[in-house]
Design a protein with these regions (language model features):
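Peripheral, non-catalytic segments flanking oxidoreductase cores
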Residues: 1-233
Length: 233
């Protein structure tokens, strides 16, 4: 669990802001793969999730996480086909993904006291893709496109799929990691959402697939850890 005013997501982009007005319950991979020798990987990705003592919560969480793993792998297959690659091109990078599930609570905003304080500061997601399930009727999510912030209202019975930093790197910015935020305006209602952040294997080397690479290769796990730690407030 990460409480309000403990994380500033804009810091992952090198932007200094007040901490975010949100809280989250977080869980990582359900199983530890055999042969994990990297101490950083073990400590950062594979610590047991401390579930609250609420009847059915743990079972529902684990079930949802597993379904998201399946869906994310299917989406990665669709991505490969869309990019003109072999159907299962990305499979070798996601044998033991270090994906995270976050249940996000953005409390009501009666007062916004600090300038540029948002419920989630402007940031991009760090992995390959994100599967977001917002509560129906929720407000506040915005993406930055063509120099403007645009609202992203939820659509009934639909996920929002977001491109992450590693997919941008793979595609040499052919597909762009979406800059987004959750704004805080006076008298906004509570916002709830579930976000599944699909992340390739800890030691997967991510490098541009196509010609004229614009970005240097990175290791999936260390990149994720560096970004995550940069947001701690």
């Amino acid at each position: 669990w990460i409480g309000p005013n403990k994380e500033a997501l804009a810091a992952s982009k090198g932007v200094k802001t007040p901490p975010d007005l949100k809280e989250s319950f977080n869980g990582g991979p359900l199983n530890i793969p055999l042969g994990v020798l990297d101490k950083q990987a073990y400590e950062f990705c594979y610590q047991p999730t401390l579930f609250p003592e609420i009847k059915g919560f743990k079972e529902a969480w684990i079930s949802y996480y597993r379904e998201m793993e399946i869906l994310a792998k299917e989406i990665m297959t669709v991505f490969a086909v869309a990019l003109g690659l072999e159907t299962h091109y990305f499979n070798k990078f996601i044998n033991h993904p270090i994906s995270a599930l976050r249940a996000l609570n953005y409390p009501p905003t009666q007062n916004v006291k600090k300038l540029e304080q948002h419920r989630a500061g402007a940031h991009t997601d760090y992995g390959s893709l994100t599967i977001l399930l917002p509560e129906p009727g929720s407000v506040g999510l915005q993406i930055f496109k063509n120099g403007k912030w645009l609202n992203v209202p939820p659509t009934k019975d639909c996920f929002i799929i977001n491109i992450g930093d590693l997919m941008e790197l793979w595609t040499s910015k052919r597909w762009v990691s979406t800059l987004h935020r959750v704004v805080a305006k006076v008298n906004q209602p509570r916002r709830l959402s579930l976000a599944f952040f699909h992340q390739p294997d800890w030691d997967a080397e991510i490098k541009p697939i196509f010609n004229k690479p614009l970005m240097k290769s990175v290791k999936s796990g260390p990149y994720l850890m560096k970004k995550f730690l940069s947001t701690s407030h």
